[in-house]
């Protein structure tokens, strides 16, 4: 027992000191002397897209994990703190994260760039079911051909915030479009 305790204390101290914010107290991390952008995302599908386009140039903080219903999600105090420290926020849009609209608006007013990734989806591609009370169906990621329109919003937002990463973001965005195109072609066969 004493040996296990003697081993547990230094291991715990190691893990505790290795977690959390940097000495400056902000949420950014440095790589090769350059601070990474802090990007907050909402849903897992938006997180996956942002991580694919951004590569290792940014730190992505996902607010919602797998199985979370974005329609009902209420941001916690931790989420609001993450949003306040973010350089960029990417969310799905089309009222998918309906309860977070006010939080996005406040973040935007404080200078954080916020992007609804669905803003480039052509209106004629959106479904308008009767039960959605005049709003489009926000579940556009189920169609990779439609969801592909969102990649450009992510690439443009990242490039605006980090012009030095322009080429990498463009390469990664094109590679992701090829992947989505392959899925679309597979689904049509």
Predicted feature descriptions by range:
Residues 3-15:
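Bacterial N-terminal signal peptides
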Residues 2-3, 137:
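Residue-level detector of alpha-helical transmembrane segments in integral membrane proteins
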Residues 15-189:
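Extracytoplasmic metal-acquisition and chelation regions
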């Amino acid at each position: 027992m004493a040996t296990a305790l003697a081993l547990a204390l230094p291991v715990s101290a190691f893990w505790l000191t290795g977690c959390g914010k940097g000495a400056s107290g902000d949420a950014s991390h440095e790589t090769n002397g350059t601070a990474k952008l802090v990007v907050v995302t909402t849903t897992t599908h938006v997180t996956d897209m942002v991580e694919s386009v951004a590569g290792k140039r940014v730190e992505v903080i996902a607010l919602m994990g797998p199985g979370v219903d974005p329609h009902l999600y209420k941001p916690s105090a931790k989420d609001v703190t993450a949003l306040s420290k973010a350089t960029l926020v990417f969310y799905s849009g089309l009222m998918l994260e309906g309860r977070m609209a006010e939080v996005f608006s406040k973040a935007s007013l404080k200078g954080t760039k916020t992007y609804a990734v669905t803003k480039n989806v052509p209106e004629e591609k959106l479904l308008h079911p009767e039960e959605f009370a005049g709003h489009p169906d926000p579940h556009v990621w189920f169609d990779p051909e439609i969801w592909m329109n969102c990649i450009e919003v992510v690439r443009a937002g990242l490039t605006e915030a980090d012009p030095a990463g322009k080429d990498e973001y463009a390469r990664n965005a094109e590679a992701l479009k090829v992947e989505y195109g392959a899925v679309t072609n597979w689904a049509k066969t």
